[in-house]
Amino acid sequence: MSVETQKETLGFQTEVKQLLHLMIHSLYSNKEIFLRELISNASDAVDKLRFEALSRPELLEGGAELKIRVSFDKDAKTVTLEDNGIGMSREDVITHLGTIAKSGTADFMKNLSGDQKKDSHLIGQFGVGFYSAFIVADQVEVFSRRAGSPSSEGVHWSSKGEGEFEVANVDKAERGTRIVLHLKNGEEEFADGYRLRNIIKKYSDHIALPIELPKEQAPAAEGEEAPAQEWETVNRASALWTRPRTEVKDEEYQEFYKHVAHDYENPLSWSHNKVEGKLEYTSLLYVPARAPFDLYQREAPRGLKLYVQRVFVMDQAESFLPLYMRFVKGVVDSNDLSLNVSREILQKDPIIDSMKSALTKRVLDMLEKLAKNEPEQYKGFWKNFGQVLKEGPAEDFANKEKIAGLLRFASTSDDSGEQSVSLADYLARGKEGQDKIYYLTGESYAQVRNSPHLEVFRKKGIEVLLLTDRIDEWLMSYLSDFDGKNFVDVARGDLDLGNLDSEEDKKAQEEIAKDKEGLIERLKAALGESVSEVRVSHRLTDSPAILAIGEQDMGLQMRQILEASGQKVPDSKPIFEFNPAHPLIGKLDAEQSEERFGDLSHILFDQAALAAGDSLKDPAAYVRRLNKLLVELSV
């Protein structure tokens, strides 16, 4: 071995110490995953070399086939994994093997469930896979040299997985990284060709470069020199997406997904397609079964792995799918793009626009198929990704109708509160002559379900969609119709049930409104600047009064969101509607004292605001008026 220089002992970052302790003590029942993680890292290192060598061919240092080699020594109780990828400098080694992103560690630890099988798959997702080596090894050595550096700039890293590690400079002729695991007592099973072969076939068959094991060779005869070691490839070593769909098993698609998505669960669905003609590309797209921890961080890394003619170009190429599909994982391999393509070029290339349009439709088709054929699976998808899909109509006008068909809502058809009703379901159940889709937005399911706005709909047996996600009012500002039927907010404007109201009903409403003109004027005077209008309600059957929103005004849900974020909210006043058939309104109409009439009017107004989910501008005045009324009633 070459002489070590500039040797120093450094302490692990606190988070790494915690992680090593967790790794060693929490994942011992699923030990074999260490090899999956180290092979995955080696594969990434080779991908990085391929990419950097596009602009700097000298990094390949005269060629040599790119590969990963796994070997073992039964006597020494070691397993060695070697790649000829990009390699690491001394600084890289200290950074990558001595520290990890604090957010990654915190999220990893937060996501640990106690289920060892699940937890063992989390380590790849949070970029801490290297440390899984300490599950089976009591000492790990890393020898590495970055491509393009002189052989004297090799580096040797060593640790026993406790509080510190050693790092020194060494000579290393070959670029890339060699990891030597010194197995713990009791872990000798891994120093075995058959065991290693099985693990590689199980977890890493899809890796698109050769993974080699030493061939078993007969021992040399006495006095003869031992023959040179021969190697054999044990995985398929071909990019899975380049193979015909008919030749790829479901299990292979699932393992490949776990590799590209760093997920432990199988995907819900996938779509594998080869496009030929004007554009030539292959895509393999996956819909995950669960949401990643950073789904709602819109600036979080997202996108597909991009390959050009099977050469890896970049991770997280976000230009191929719209933002509302940021949960989709997979790869796209193009024959039409340049190998030196950059993120900036991707944003301006018309080829990308065509591919993005086609891939977006592909994902929507996949979701439609899932919703139709696997409704229970789609329910799971909706719980995880529904709010993200709701961003779609605003971002993707061309596919608005398709996206709308995938949305799911709670409704008055049952009391479960589950978002399971599609717009197609709603229309299929519609009343004869119903030409509108009715909905109500609010802060919570309990609030909208008990809203006075629904009274007339319950009386007539008309279903109303109940929307309670924060994004819903914003969503509905981009959805005007579906399948030729307009959306109508039941809390907005003057309610018109169209064909669902008989001519007799309409005539009776007009006569009542005329009859109550005097009461309307008194209420306008009493409520003054608090309201934009006072009118007789056609919405109510049980409640005395209600607040409606002006046709062009901002809804309460959107107003509350903007106020909470400190943004300026445009002024608007509600419409006060009253139920002329309610006994309280009858008493109000008969009230002779204008002072008492004013107090009662304000109490009804404040109660209507509370029923709508709004907060009172002057709660003390409301309590004072209510107490005054209670005292008068008790005398």
UniProtKB/Swiss-Prot annotation:
InterPro entries: HATPase_C_sf, Heat_shock_protein_90_CS, HSP90_C, Hsp90_fam, Hsp90_N, Ribosomal_Su5_D2-typ_SF
Function: Molecular chaperone. Has ATPase activity.
Matching SMART domains: HATPase_c
Oligomer and partners: Homodimer.
Localization (cell): Cytoplasm
Region (C): 561-635
SUPFAM superfamilies: ATPase domain of HSP90 chaperone/DNA topoisomerase II/histidine kinase, HSP90 C-terminal domain, Ribosomal protein S5 domain 2-like
Any one cellular-component term (Gene Ontology): cytoplasm
Protein name, UniProt field: Chaperone protein HtpG
Residue span of region B: 344-560
UniProt cross-references to HAMAP family, sorted A to Z: HSP90
Pfam families registered for this protein in UniProt: HATPase_c_3, HSP90
Gene Ontology MF annotations: ATP binding; ATP hydrolysis activity; ATP-dependent protein folding chaperone; unfolded protein binding
